[in-house]
């Protein structure tokens, strides 16, 4: 286990409703307030009425909302739902392995999250959905995710080492693509794996305001 990032000054609230992809209402300190949702995924298993959430006040005069949604309760733990942290988490993990790291590297009409040592192409995806002991991605259809897989496969054919890291924030022992929600992405992930794209599912938790890296979990194709 390894502490990655500390998220200070969070406050507890009660989720009321999601207005759209990026806006929700919660009950906080005896008031109904608007909060910004950074993760555009469906998050239906986390963002439902009366569920407990964590938010953080943002000091900015350029925003309509004064709070960011940080995490939502699932059973005995909080699950991170703030996708802005994904890059910081991934970079902390990758810098343990690589010395030279470039972020947001252009490839044709896409941008790949990281290029390490000028030869390892790495894409990052955040996963908040778990079903029993199985984490699943995506929780909504993702054409962009499928395109990223196609890019990694193309780079692999050119002789590069390519990786897709899944940052898993809901407790699980296994990871599988979500065939029911996005069959196209799931089959493409199988194809990428067969071609030699490395799939790395990493489990994290939110403990005492720290995002904690726990371990790599097992990949299973169960579709």
UniProtKB/Swiss-Prot annotation:
InterPro entries: SfsA (IPR005224), SfsA_C (IPR040452), SfsA_N (IPR041465)
Signal sequence region: none
One GO molecular-function entry: DNA binding
PANTHER family documented for this protein: SUGAR FERMENTATION STIMULATION PROTEIN A (PTHR30545:SF2)
UniProt-listed HAMAP family: SfsA
Family statement: Belongs to the SfsA family.
The name this protein goes by in its record: Sugar fermentation stimulation protein homolog
Protein's organism: Thermosipho melanesiensis (strain DSM 12029 / CIP 104789 / BI429)
């Amino acid at each position: 286990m390894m502490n990655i990032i500390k998220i200070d000054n969070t406050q507890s609230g009660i989720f009321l409703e999601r207005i759209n992809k990026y806006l929700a209402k919660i009950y906080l300190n005896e008031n109904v307030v608007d909060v910004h949702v950074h993760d555009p995924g469906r998050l239906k298993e986390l963002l439902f009425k009366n569920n407990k959430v964590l938010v953080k006040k943002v000091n900015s005069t350029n925003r309509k909302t004064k709070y960011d949604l940080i995490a939502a309760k699932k059973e005995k733990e909080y699950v991170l739902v703030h996708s802005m942290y994904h890059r910081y988490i991934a970079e902390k993990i990758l810098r343990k392995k690589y010395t030279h790291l470039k972020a947001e590297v252009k490839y044709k009409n896409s941008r790949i999250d990281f290029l390490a040592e000028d030869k390892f192409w790495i894409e990052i995806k955040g996963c908040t959905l778990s079903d029993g002991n199985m984490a699943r991605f995506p929780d909504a259809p993702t054409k962009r995710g499928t395109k990223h897989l196609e890019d990694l496969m193309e780079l692999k054919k050119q002789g590069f080492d390519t990786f897709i890291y899944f940052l898993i924030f809901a407790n699980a022992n296994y990871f599988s693509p979500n065939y029911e929600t996005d069959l196209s992405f799931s089959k493409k992930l199988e194809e990428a794996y067969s071609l030699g794209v490395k799939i790395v599912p990493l489990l994290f938790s939110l403990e005492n305001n720290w995002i904690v890296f726990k371990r790599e979990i097992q990949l299973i194709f169960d579709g």
